[in-house]
């Protein structure tokens, strides 16, 4: 784009395009979008508030651009000496170049007397030009734009124009006053001030500068008075809104050297100054006062200026506060996006890791998360405050709060995730540590204090959680408080501790139950093994009297109660080291009693299984039948009352069946008060405490009564057991009877007399024959030696064994020979355990008929196993 005979801006060559500055607004009222690039190119953007904006007004072709070029070292286009036409079109801007030259050439001790930094100069299109004619729209818009943005308004007039209305730009100044009043009405909270700097050109000195100053002030007062003021401002003065400065410069062409010197002198006035209250607020130093500054940061000036011009060119009411707020919103949002880039670089890696860990189901405590969050938050807020605090305060605070919310929303998620991970990992580590310590104590075989282990590991877990939480806390963030999380963590630790204690008490109860099972198994087994032993041999106790069979349940109950009482003492003593509550101990003891009864009942059922009980009844019967009261085995003779002893022993043993069929105490003649002994269900018991318990009749509501619980044998089993026992007893009786009958075979005395009479010749023959006699002698000597060595007994036993074996073998072969034939007698076999009895038909006296009847029954029944 070409304007004023040179490029206004070009993208390819910034140095060439910005040699003459930048055209802010062209003659068609279009705003230049590259203004921000120019400010960045000139290094003004990072200046913040350390910049100043000056605008120059004046009639066309009065040397405004020339004045600026000499005064600020700019390169604005100037009018050709041979032509009288418009040169500056629209509004141009350039940075002060004289400042850079002075900084390079001045000595260090003169640095404080140089021009202010970052002075921006706007060259406004001249008024009263023939190109615009009577169109004063751009004149008014440009004046409003300059007044809304500039600190100092330079009015360029010639000396001979002072006192004139149009020539002295009084019409333009009236426009300036009117638009200033318009701006003031929109911004009632403050009174914006500007400096009107009159530079009188071609000053000859004939009329003193003070007189020219008075003339101009009178004209300005008159214009101000003629303005229509809004309500409440009727008595306002021009000094309420403007300050005035005056300077005079000699003729440029006729007094060139003096002009240059005065311009240089004038340039030194463009620096920071202040009001001295001791001198009536008189300005000292430079002309740039802080109250003139529009408080628009340099990095937002381009956006602000564009918004101002858009309002002006569209004939909208210009509202500077609103524009400042809009600018602040725009720039704060922009700055927020910029600073969040660095924030994302610091935070996103942790967010990604935490999300992956949560998705995998293994939350992880990340080291360094807390410092990273703190640094990211502090640096982001600091960077935002550095850049954005220069803008509208309310907007800045609002945007700062929004930025904090954005960051805190993400940081809070990280914070919560970190605490959640610390919570879960802490609970897992606590549980594992307690279990490991308990196992270590069990392996050592020594007693360990479970409560001490839990308290120690709980303290370690709390310290670890607090360390992780403190490392993640962000100071100043209201959400960065882990009090609730810590309370929840402590609550879960207590819950886990209670569960671990409950599990340990369960294990303790299991160990005690095993001990009870072992003790009851031995004690109850001994009672049943000693059941009905009627002899003083192996079945009787080593010391003391034989226990009565009638009191077997009393003894079992006493053993049971004593064993459980000892187990309860063991449980209570061990549970005290768990720091268990009374309720938990009560539940444990209640469960122990129920479990112990189940163990006893199981042991009784085992002992009273049909095979076991039948064996014990047979042993009881045999002890009473085969042994006398002293425990000596009976040798059956035909003269013994076998049938009487058999009947007595059988009936005595049969009395045990009804005795054993019901758990009844002999002392009270009633069943034990099991429901009272077990006790009521503790109030602290949970359904989990009862789910593995076997219902007990008379205690639980399972439909069984206490009598049914104490019934060990049903009526059907009793009858079946009685029948089978009688058959086994009959077999023992038959064996005893056969043994008695076998003892009757004796050799008569007359047989020996007959043998001597009939064998006398043979005896004489032996005595007369030397060989026979010698053989007899040898046999006699051998018999004598055997007698002396006491070997007759062993030899007789060996002979008996050999003969018995020969007889058995003969019987077997004879049986095999007669087996296909129906002729012969068949023996009956009675088995019990590993014993086998073979019986043939025994017919003798009055017992022959009875034995034959039993044999007939046995042939029908077949073989019985016990």
UniProtKB/Swiss-Prot annotation:
Region (Disordered), start-end ranges: 840-866
Residue ranges that the UniProt entry lists as topological domain Cytoplasmic: 1-746, 792-866
A Pfam match: RHD3_GTPase
Binding positions (GTP): 58-65
Keyword Heme: no
Summary of the function given for this chain in its UniProt record: Cooperates with the reticulon proteins and tubule-shaping DP1 family proteins to generate and maintain the structure of the tubular endoplasmic reticulum network. Has GTPase activity, which is required for its function in ER organization.
Official protein name in the record: Protein SEY1
Organism lineage string: Eukaryota, Fungi, Dikarya, Ascomycota, Pezizomycotina
Gene for this chain: SEY1
